[in-house]
Amino acid sequence: MASTYSFDIVSDFDRQELVNAVDQARREIKQRYDLKDTQTEIELEEGSLTITTANDMALNSIRDLLLTKAAKRGLSLKIFDFQPPESAGGNRVRQVVHLKKGIDATLAKQIAKQIRDNFKKVQPAIQGDLVRVSGKDKDELQAVIQMLRQQDYPVALQFVNYR
């Protein structure tokens, strides 16, 4: 009896690593001479970050600092969706950063179609915000993973539950 193997394609990030990256950025903001007196706040909510600071120059520096800390913690930079900066009153600037999580339906359909077109022996199935790929040959599944890693998608893809 031949068994089937499968894996899931998801778009997720490690929340604790994000918390650590934000904490490191806050600490460095307090230490850096050019950012010390800007009264910068980085607030981490469930699905977004809010950066509030004195001016656009400080905002750009903080954005670069946050991205650097996130990359060093192993987070993909594709999870950050920077919204346009807005005035926060009192000569301050605020920028909201949405955190991308999950694969939307159109991208899931695109991934499933690409797998179906290139690999006839595996079956992709869309299940909510993940795509499950199953097949009888482990090597085919490995080839699917390699093909998807070479593509450039607007979200960071992870491959989990490989059985």
Swiss-Prot record:
Q: Which domain of life is it from?
A: Bacteria
Q: Which GO terms describe its cellular component?
A: cytosol
Q: Which keywords label this protein?
A: Nucleotide-binding
Q: Function, please?
A: Nucleotide-binding protein.
Kindly give the InterPro entries that the UniProt entry links to this protein: DUF520, UPF0234-like_C, UPF0234_N, YajQ-like_sf
Kindly provide the name given to this protein in its UniProt entry: Nucleotide-binding protein CYB_0891
Tell me the protein family, please. Answer: Belongs to the YajQ family.
